[in-house]
Amino acid sequence: MDVEKYLQERARMVEEEIDRWFPREVKPEVLARASRHLLEAGGKRLRPCLVLTSCEAVGGRVGDAIEAAAALELLHNFTLIHDDIMDRDEFRRNVKTVHVLWGEPVAIIAGDALFAKVFEALAANAKRLKLPAERAVELFDTISKASFEICQGQALDMLFEGRKDITEAEYLSMIGSKTGALLEASSKIGALLGDGGPKQVKALAEYGRLVGVAFQIRDD
């Protein structure tokens, strides 16, 4: 199998789905432009691809998790917008950051708008598949807990600034929350939507978290 081609095809599917959930026609125009700014600047689309590949890995079809795949990318970009504000970063993906172009108030609401759409897209996915209530609850429980854990990771990252005595355990805990949590949620949600069994869901969730930790170690 041509892995690169496989991922490119799924990335294109995700782009189309993102446009459906957060189109350029969103009003007011400044909200659409600010919210979509980093989405249109590129990115690896790693998280949505994890959703789709995990879904397929347990026997589901790629279309079974397409709304969720878009939702995870929207959530990721929400965290990037707010992260850039806190870190005072001026560039990301070779373009100016949202708060630099539109100011912090607009950047905050642009991120919030993306976050709101996450749950709408997930709800649509669950409704379309007619997910059993217990599995739908697990879907939203997963995304909610991951969102909170990302906040914990970011808080730790901020507290670590200026410290020179950070232990390996502290560092791994921080990146596990800040980066690993969202990739864990991505692979777990894909497995849930693909109708994976408990062992499959658990294994893919653990895999996603480890991928996230490894990714962040390499990035750092």
Where are these predicted regions, by residue range?
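Mg2+-dependent prenyl diphosphate-binding active-site environment of isoprenoid biosynthetic enzymes
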Residues: 19-220
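N-terminal amphipathic/basic leader segments beginning at the initiator methionine
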Residues: 1-22
